[in-house]
Amino acid sequence: MAVHKYYQLSGETIKARKPICPRCGNGVFLAEHEDRMSCGRCGYTEFKK
């Protein structure tokens, strides 16, 4: 997937479209699953309520 699809431009600000992994930092996003969000790099998982 192209990098420009991960960010949203509005005026002069850039915002990430997906949540960023708190362990890995900027540039690594959490994949959204039906019941959780997980990082493919470090394995960090957040479960949805």
UniProtKB/Swiss-Prot annotation:
Keywords assigned: Metal-binding, Ribonucleoprotein, Ribosomal protein, Zinc, Zinc-finger
Q: Which residues bind Zn(2+)?
A: 21, 24, 39, 42
Name a single GO cellular component: ribosome
Which Pfam families does its entry note? Ribosomal_S27
Cofactors that this protein relies on: Zn(2+)
Zinc fingers (C4-type), as residue ranges, are 21-42
The UniProt note on the cofactor reads as follows: Binds 1 zinc ion per subunit.
Instruction: Say which domain of life the source belongs to.
Output: Archaea
Molecular function in Gene Ontology: structural constituent of ribosome; zinc ion binding
The protein's matches in InterPro entries, at most eight in alphabetical order, are given as: Ribosomal_eS31 (IPR002906), Ribosomal_eS31_arc (IPR022845), Ribosomal_zn-bd (IPR011332)
GO BP terms, alphabetized: translation
Which residues, by range, are in coiled-coil regions?
Answer: none
Subunit details: Part of the 30S ribosomal subunit.
Q: HAMAP family per the record?
A: Ribosomal_eS31 (MF_00777)
Protein family membership: Belongs to the eukaryotic ribosomal protein eS31 family.
Protein name, please? Small ribosomal subunit protein eS31
